[in-house]
Amino acid sequence: MEPFLIGGISQQVSVTLGVSTYQQARSISSQDRVEKIARRLVRQAELATLNAKQVGAPFLHFCKEMDDKVKKHNLLVEQLTQAVKNDELEVHFQPIIDVQSNTVAKFESLVRWRNHGQWVSPAVFIPLAEESRVIIELGELVLRKTCQQIKYLEAQGYNQFVFNVNRSLFEFTEFNPHRNAWLEIITEQNVNPSQISFELTESVLAPENTNHLEVLTQLKSAGCLISLDDFGTGYSSLSYLRRFPVDVLKLDKSFIDEIHTNSGDEALVKSIIQMSQVLGIKVVAEGVELQQQLAVLKEAGCDFIQGYYFSKPLPGDEIQAFLTQLAREH
């Protein structure tokens, strides 16, 4: 479509269409049935329009697969909501290793969902949780289970670990700073706030989200730590370190994958580590899978590593055995 002028400004308009058809040949006698069919056709056309936008097509005809996809999506949302309500999700914990001592310093809490015997990927159910707003309850569930794990390990004689708990932009956007539910849970579970690190993505710290500083300040004042996840994958990352009270940077796996073979990645990671040392910020390298990667990171002065080289995320009842085995090996 050609652009046109409004007030001397060129405007470009695009159209996306969804098409639905009624193919039954016989006449429709009932007015109620006419209205029912019309509503169905409109709904199908809206669904086709939505699918056309998702794939970037100018138009799409409705097909049954679109309806099946929506029904499956809605069923999964309902099942997730019930799973959160019934406390059916699990939390696994991935060890984070001190590079110099080869001992566990931290764990990252990672939520897992087994739906009718099958694991559902977090990449699938976390967006569903945000869309349905059940992410608030889910986040509180993860924090509560993390605190319970801390108390369990404490009873076994382990009281030195920090646990990272992820928080999304949506959770911050919906958060009520006048009733800090996260700190309430930590207090309720009788956990030292210094053992909890809230792990955020750069989107939480974006310039337009200045109100999030109040929440971060509350958490820091209580003694919690703040970790910035996936550092370097967004934009203007350096400004966040000046504006927000960040304790730890987590280097994204994409920087680590080829650090032992790509001199550019190695130089970039070393620069970030050196900068962090000057600022008094610790660095965690994520996605470490090879001994060669570990060697480069250790030589560069990285503080902590996380990844399958040491361990996958573990159920809570397997942590003690892992700690014993690691101590025996190192």
Task: Describe the predicted segments one by one.
Residues 1-15, 30, 53, 118, ...:
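Catalytic core regions of nucleotide second-messenger enzymes
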Residues 7-10, 15-41, 65-68, 96-101, ...:
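Catalytic strand-loop-helix junctions within cyclic-nucleotide turnover domains
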Residues 14, 21, 31-35, 51-75, ...:
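Flexible, glycine/charge-rich interdomain/linker segments that couple
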Residues 14, 21-25, 101-108, 134-212, ...:
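Catalytic core of bacterial c-di-GMP phosphodiesterases, primarily the EAL and HD-GYP domains
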Residues 22-56, 123-124, 185, 284-287, ...:
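Catalytic-core segments of nucleotide cyclases and related cyclic-nucleotide turnover enzymes
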Residues 39-63, 79-90, 114, 284, ...:
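Catalytic/regulatory signature loops of cyclic-dinucleotide turnover enzymes
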Residues 65, 72-128, 166, 228, ...:
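Active-site core of bacterial EAL-family cyclic-dinucleotide phosphodiesterase domains
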Residues 116, 168-175, 195-209, 222-330:
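EAL-family c-di-GMP phosphodiesterase catalytic domain
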